[in-house]
Amino acid sequence: MEKVYTKNAPDAIGPYSQAMKVGNLVFTSGQIAINPASGSVEATTIEAQTEQVCKNLCAVLEAAGTSIEKAVKTTCFLSDMADFASFNEVYGRYFTNKPARSCVAAKQLPKNVLVEVEVIAEL
């Protein structure tokens, strides 16, 4: 088991790592729309937040030695399911291999963001 860390994605905001490598898989922690350069949430729309989340995930996966194209499963959390279609538009541009996915509504997400996504990917 190996911890993954990159300064190109936000630091964890709790007692967890950005990702863990186990065997031939990497498990990311949920990423929210924190800009790693500023350490704050700057995006306000579901589209812009999803874009930042996907960029953060790409950085973590790259640090682990893999890529978003090797994602096998994602779990997505939306604060409002009315954002589902707009979320999917941006998500689909990044996850072109269409990994297995669960998407659920969460009453409230950290820092009051609109979206959070975690990934399991093959190394």
Show which residues each predicted segment covers.
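Short, polar/acidic, helix-capping and beta-turn segments at strand->helix junctions
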Residues: 1-123
